[in-house]
């Protein structure tokens, strides 16, 4: 049995979960998320718990079981507390600024890079070198943070670029002269 899939999901008191067929809707203080799950899984819901049940022990069902449970748990945590990723800009003259809801990055190109905020995503800029991406969908926050990082990934020689907070960048030694 899947170790993740067999865990029962606790539903906090200020969050409501509704299951209609294979669509799960989660409402909480921060907002609402809805997702269509695998149709083979079934759900047992009590007042404060939700259990994901797989129909058989086939390999296909086992692979989806834990994933489905983790996705539902992430939705519950997102509408209750939200998700946040922080990125750091390292380099001379690298800076970020807000323009309305959008993010403008000056990271060594001849032009500023503009990143638009999707629905449910907010950007925050602190000290011009720290960018915070926040939202209720873990997938969406991670994808946008990854897009921001891919504008100028950290390079191994000087360490310049955009990196996640706390990310270790492996440094290389430069060429040795004659």
Curated annotation (Swiss-Prot):
Pfam families: Ribosomal_L6. One of its GO terms (biological process) is cytoplasmic translation. The keyword Ribonucleoprotein applies. GO terms for cellular component: cytosolic large ribosomal subunit. PROSITE patterns: RIBOSOMAL_L6_1 (PS00525). Keywords: Ribonucleoprotein, Ribosomal protein, RNA-binding, rRNA-binding. It comes from the Bacteria. GO terms for molecular function: rRNA binding; structural constituent of ribosome. Part of the 50S ribosomal subunit. Belongs to the universal ribosomal protein uL6 family. PANTHER family: 60S/50S RIBOSOMAL PROTEIN L6/L9, LARGE RIBOSOMAL SUBUNIT PROTEIN UL6M. This protein binds to the 23S rRNA, and is important in its secondary structure. It is located near the subunit interface in the base of the L7/L12 stalk, and near the tRNA binding site of the peptidyltransferase center. This is Large ribosomal subunit protein uL6. It comes from Staphylococcus saprophyticus subsp. saprophyticus (strain ATCC 15305 / DSM 20229 / NCIMB 8711 / NCTC 7292 / S-41). The gene is rplF.
């Amino acid at each position: 049995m899947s170790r993740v899939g067999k865990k029962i999901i606790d539903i906090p008191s200020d969050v409501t979960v509704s299951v209609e067929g294979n669509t799960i809707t989660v409402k909480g203080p921060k907002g609402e998320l809805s997702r269509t799950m695998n149709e083979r899984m079934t759900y047992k819901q009590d007042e404060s718990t939700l259990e994901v049940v797989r129909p058989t022990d086939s390999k296909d069902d086992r692979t989806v079981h834990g994933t489905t449970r983790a996705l539902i748990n992430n939705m519950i945590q997102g509408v209750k507390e939200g998700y946040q990723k922080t990125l750091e800009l390292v380099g001379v003259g690298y800076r970020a600024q807000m323009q309305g809801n959008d993010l403008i990055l000056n990271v060594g190109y001849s032009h500023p890079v503009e990143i638009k905020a999707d629905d449910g995503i907010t950007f925050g800029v602190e000290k011009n070198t720290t960018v915070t991406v926040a939202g209720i969908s873990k997938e969406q926050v991670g994808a946008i943070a990854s897009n921001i990082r891919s504008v100028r990934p950290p390079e191994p020689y000087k360490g310049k670029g955009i990196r996640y907070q706390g990310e270790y960048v492996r440094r290389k030694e430069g060429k040795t002269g004659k």
